[in-house]
């Protein structure tokens, strides 16, 4: 309990930062798995976070991830990704992100993970965004958009299920 209380005092949100929850756990408990979901320490940590944020205890996995993110914590930043196309991203200085701009201009897909999204201030698009879960459908739509040079449609592919990177 003491370790969790100490960790709560060092949540990244206190410094307006973001950190991987495994790294956070390792720094404060010497165990990267200390705050894995379904552990007692995670349960205590989550209760402390909801207390500080003045929100109800989360009922779903998505709600848990949202609360963790508000506290400055996120799950695995690399494997938590989605694919996007024809979306423009802007950095913390409200400047176009050059990597995203290149994929946008060439009508190509970009796999975006949580670590990538940490440096994005906002994302803009055209008139519509189609969100699909199937990569083959995503690829077919992108080919059609590219072939016909349709500029007013953006795409997001969740690759089977909605993870937190797609939600953001």
PLM ranges: what are they?
Residues 1-157, 162-167:
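Nucleic-acid enzyme cleavage-core boundary/entry regions
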